[in-house]
Amino acid sequence: MHDKLLIEGKLIAGNGEALAVFNPATGEQIAAIPQADLHQIDAAVLAAESAFAHWGQTTPKTRATLLLKIADAIEENAEVFAKLESLNCGKPYHAVLNDEVPAVADVFRFFAGAARCLSGSAAGEYLEGHTSMIRRDPVGVVASIAPWNYPLMMASWKLAPALAAGNCVVLKPAEQTPLTTFYLAHLLADILPAGVVNIVFGRGADIGDALTGHEKVNMVSLTGSIATGAHILAHTAASVKRTHMELGGKAPVIVFDDADIDQVVDGIRSFGFYNAGQDCTAACRLYVQRAVYDEVVEALGKAVATLKIGDPRDETTELGPLITEPQLERVMGFVERAKALPHITVVTGGERVKGTGFYFQPTVLAGAKQDDEIVQKEVFGPVISITSFDDEAQVIGWANASNYGLASSVWTRDIGRAHRLAACLQYGCTWVNTHFMLVSEMPHGGQKLSGYGKDMSMYGLEDYTIVRHIMIRH
């Protein structure tokens, strides 16, 4: 098992306290991995700064070629990555192998192509005797903080656009889930020039703060909680660093009475519970028009009850565990408080699964009201709420009455209605008659407390650049 930091092209052991890493499916410890110490954080940032002097000047073709090599290496090691991610996160192995690892490789391939298409505005004479042009240049040293729910995928979302734009990166994976990132470090050491990517490890409260607050870091990119985002913004405010924040979500799923109910049920069964609901875009906050409310509640309850919970190594397993015991207890707390409300009905689930591991039953809670905690707060587990609504105006108001603004979906056969709602919903993405679908070519990111900046797409690449005006007198 790889457990080495990557600093200046060398794989080295951390000099700090060892942190225990667990298998969520069993609750057993699988590794004890030393953190970086503060000297190693400093060395990683300085290595990135030194490498940037050359990497920032390389041609797009050169960067693209190396990104394609990374994609090839990920595909060649797909089974290893899938086994490690499944072991460390409790994800079903087949889902990681067939869904997530190919998507990771595709992100690197997309940004390899995008690197060769990045350009500024056309030159022109806007002042007599002077020619102006726009450059898009790399930011410099980027400190990237990845979350625990999709460790490898989020590492790719952080690394690929930053490298494509010509930046150097110091990446810190979540302390709970470092295994695939360490394996990636082992591969990157043989592909990239020394210092272009550095990978460190440790708790956010000390190692994360040292990294994001380092004076030589030009930009911080985070995928994480609102609390972590707010902390980093406060911590780095004095240095006015550039920041990219992808934070929490509480996706409204709006089901009209003309929707294809079978399609709705199949979709929510998948998109509300993938990765045990530990996804910022999970289809978790259902608003169902009153005429079909009872039908949807009954059908969805029956469908969700068939989700198979089990060993991540079993090809028939659909739902794995939550990431840690504290996360399980957090989800249980949300559900218990909801169950205590007289108007809420547990349609299915609602309990911890007996036995080992951090499993929670897939849960459907009907009768929820707009102001209920279960409707307003991000649970980040296999739990969905269902609320009835009367008309468009009411449901648009309810959907937008949220601190979150990441993802949403509308289910209807009326294309005019779909366009109206898509124009009104205050979310970074609105799907129609589907949910959860992401592609490398399209941007992902939120608004309000869900953050700002875009992952993937050309917009994601541009986020890691600085726009500069060059004016030449002649």
Swiss-Prot record:
One of its GO terms (biological process) is putrescine catabolic process. The active site is at E246, C280 (nucleophile). Its EC number is 1.2.1.19, 1.2.1.-. GO terms for molecular function: aminobutyraldehyde dehydrogenase (NAD+) activity; NAD binding. Pathway: Amine and polyamine degradation; putrescine degradation; 4-aminobutanoate from 4-aminobutanal: step 1/1; Amino-acid degradation. It comes from the Bacteria. Disulfide bonds: none annotated. Gene3D superfamilies: Aldehyde Dehydrogenase, Chain A, domain 1, Aldehyde Dehydrogenase, Chain A, domain 2. It catalyses: 4-aminobutanal + NAD(+) + H2O = 4-aminobutanoate + NADH + 2 H(+); 5-aminopentanal + NAD(+) + H2O = 5-aminopentanoate + NADH + 2 H(+). InterPro entries: Ald_DH/histidinol_DH, Ald_DH_C, Ald_DH_CS_GLU, Ald_DH_N, Aldehyde_DH_dom, Aminobutyraldehyde_DH, PatD. NAD(+) binds at A146, P147, W148, K172, P173, A174, E175, D209, S225, I226, A227, T228, C280. It is an enzyme of class 1 (oxidoreductase). Pfam families: Aldedh. Keywords: NAD, Oxidoreductase. HAMAP family: Aldedh_Prr (MF_01275). 4-aminobutanal can spontaneously cyclize to 1-pyrroline, and 5-aminopentanal to 1-piperideine. Homotetramer. Catalyzes the oxidation 4-aminobutanal (gamma-aminobutyraldehyde) to 4-aminobutanoate (gamma-aminobutyrate or GABA). This is the second step in one of two pathways for putrescine degradation, where putrescine is converted into 4-aminobutanoate via 4-aminobutanal. Also functions as a 5-aminopentanal dehydrogenase in a a L-lysine degradation pathway to succinate that proceeds via cadaverine, glutarate and L-2-hydroxyglutarate. Belongs to the aldehyde dehydrogenase family. Gamma-aminobutyraldehyde dehydrogenase subfamily. This is Gamma-aminobutyraldehyde dehydrogenase. The lineage of its organism: Bacteria, Pseudomonadati, Pseudomonadota, Gammaproteobacteria, Enterobacterales.
